[in-house]
Amino acid sequence: MWIIILIVIIVIITIIFSKRDVVSQSSLDIQRYMGTWYEIARLPTSFQKGCVNSTANYQLLEPNKIQVTNNCEINGRINSVTGTAIPAANTRIVSGFLTPASLMVNFGYGFSPYNVIFIDENYQYAIVSGGNDTLWILSRFKNINQSTYNQLVTIVYNQGYDVNNLIRN
C-alpha cells in the first residue's frame, strides 16, 4: 500500500515540476520582425514588476546581431533597457530567415533564451517565450480586440502555459 502511495506522490510531483519543451516557430523573417512591438500580456517577471505600456523595439545591427530596446512605464516614469540578441545554438540565418526562431538576448546580465513560438502570417502578432516561466504576447498595435486576444491566449494555453497568471497590459 505504501508503495502505491509513494508512486502516486512521485507521479504528481513529476507532473507539477516537469518542464515543457519550448518549441519555436520553424523560421522567422528577421526584417519583417524588426521594429516596434507592444506588449499585450505577459507572465509575471521580477524585472517587469509594476510595468505598464511596455514596448520592445528590434533593430538589425549586423546579419547576426539585433539591438533590443525594451521600454515600460513605472509610476509615470519611462524605464528603458537596451541589449543585444544573437542566434541561439543550432540556429542559422539563411536568406534573411532565422531557422528556427530562437535567439539569445543579453541585457548585461548574461544571455537568456528568446523563442518566437508564434507569429501570424502578417507579422502583426507574436508570442515569445523566454523559457518555461516567461512569456509575452506582442502586437504591432497598442490595443487589440477581445477576439484576437482570446485567440492568442488559446495558443499560449495550448503551449502548456498557465494562462490564469497572464497580466494584460
From Swiss-Prot:
GO biological process terms held by the UniProt record: response to stress
Domain of life: Viruses
Subcellular location: Secreted; Virion
GO cellular component terms listed in the entry, alphabetical order: extracellular region; virion component
Signal peptide extent: 1-18
The entry's keywords: Secreted, Signal, Transport, Virion
Family, per entry: Belongs to the calycin superfamily. Lipocalin family.
Chain's role: Could play a role in the transport of a small ligand.
Name listed for the protein in its UniProt record: Putative lipocalin R877
Organism: Acanthamoeba polyphaga mimivirus (APMV)
